[in-house]
């Protein structure tokens, strides 16, 4: 049991060290997140009176921005040089069809869930359970898109599912440690929102670190006004750091099995 704990801690320590190095290279992704968020909010204002056409517009803008941020995170993780303004501009359009196609696959079942909820408000528990299941099984979909070779949106979903089955403890433990003190209600709120798009909704990606950080600051007794200011200021770097950490953790978990990590941990401890 001690060996399991040691190997897991070593895994997270290495991922955190790699994250810090990637943040130095990819710090420009932080102001990019701010600009992308403003663009997404502008798109919402433009799309609001356009009905169904506005929905298609929002989907396209979301796919463009999600693909761009995933491209920047990929460069921060894999690259050997600092990200430049040119990289930010060139990132627009990357992974557009990957994000759009996965979103289309999930759109119909999500629409049916919403229709069911409107027709029968008592089905709230069933809808929440379904979205929780999607949130869990498709949680690594963003990392699958930019860190693996895949043939189709269904392949992305299958690879996400397989990854979670193999690595669910190590993958979800950091999230559990962060959210556990804040209560189950916040967890179910976040899972219901993220489950709708498999983590590929840009506004939700911004919303998660903002909400979690706000909850932590509130628990520490900080006033609502100061909490809002601090959360707004720290959300972009927290979002980028979270995505980079997830990417490094995904790479580490995909490259080795749990048994291999246990063996490597024993070798690492004996070498110290």
Locate predicted features.
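Hydrophobic alpha-helical membrane segments
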Residues: 1-272
């Amino acid at each position: 049991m001690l060996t399991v704990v040691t190997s897991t801690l070593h895994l997270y320590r290495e991922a955190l060290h790699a994250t810090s190095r990637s943040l130095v290279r990819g710090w420009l992704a932080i102001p990019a997140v701010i600009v992308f968020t403003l663009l997404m909010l502008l798109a919402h204002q433009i799309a609001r009176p356009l009905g169904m056409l506005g929905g298609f517009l929002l989907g396209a803008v979301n796919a463009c921005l999600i693909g761009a941020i995933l491209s920047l995170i990929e460069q921060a993780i894999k690259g050997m040089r600092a990200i430049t303004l040119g990289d930010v501009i060139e990132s627009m359009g990357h992974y557009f069809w990957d994000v759009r196609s996965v979103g289309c696959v999930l759109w119909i079942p999500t629409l049916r869930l919403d229709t069911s909820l409107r027709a029968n408000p008592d089905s709230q528990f069933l809808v929440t359970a379904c979205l929780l299941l999607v949130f869990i099984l498709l949680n690594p979909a963003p990392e699958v898109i930019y860190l693996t070779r895949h043939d189709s949106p269904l392949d992305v979903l299958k690879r996400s599912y397989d990854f979670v089955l193999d690595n669910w403890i190590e993958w979800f433990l950091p999230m559990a440690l962060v959210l556990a003190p804040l209560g189950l209600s916040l967890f179910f709120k976040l899972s219901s929102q993220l489950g709708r798009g498999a983590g590929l909704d840009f506004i939700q990606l911004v919303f998660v670190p903002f909400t979690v950080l706000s909850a932590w600051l509130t628990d520490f007794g900080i006033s609502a006004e100061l909490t809002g200011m601090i959360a707004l200021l720290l959300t972009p770097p927290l979002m980028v750091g979270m995505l980079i950490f997830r990417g490094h953790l995904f790479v580490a978990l995909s490259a080795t099995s749990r048994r291999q990590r246990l063996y490597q941990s024993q070798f690492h401890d004996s070498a110290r």
